[in-house]
From Swiss-Prot:
The lineage of its organism: Archaea, Methanobacteriati, Methanobacteriota, Stenosarchaea group, Methanomicrobia. InterPro entries: Ribosomal_eL21, Ribosomal_eL21_arc, Ribosomal_eL21_CS, Ribosomal_eL21_sf, Translation_prot_SH3-like_sf. HAMAP family: Ribosomal_eL21. Coiled coil: none annotated. GO terms for molecular function: structural constituent of ribosome. This is Large ribosomal subunit protein eL21.
Length: 96
């Protein structure tokens, strides 16, 4: 079988949901708001394809730096490099 290099490769177990969590997320996850400077966790919701960050950022925590359209811009520290990630609110969870 040919080797494919899609954006969701190697995510068979990483993006898998629990049985009762399957299906579309609640509307409250779509309309959640964040403050600039707030810490958020990146938890990719595999049932929503729009605004999905890259799989390497799944499980990381970033700081909100602004909004771009319906998505939020975050800064992430990847080793010594500071990276900007753009993700929709369905894939973000506020840090408690």
């Amino acid at each position: 079988m040919a080797h494919h290099n899609g954006p969701r490769k190697k995510t068979r177990y990483k993006f898998k949901k629990e049985l009762r969590q399957r299906g579309l997320p609640p509307v409250t996850s779509v309309i959640q708001q964040f403050e600039v400077g707030e810490k958020v966790h990146i938890v990719v919701n595999s049932s929503v394809q729009k605004g999905m960050p890259h799989r390497r950022f799944h499980g990381l925590t970033g700081t909100v730096i602004g909004k771009r359209g319906r998505a939020w811009m975050l800064t992430i520290h990847d080793g010594n490099a500071e990276k900007t990630v753009i993700a929709r609110p369905q894939h973000l969870k506020a840090q408690k």
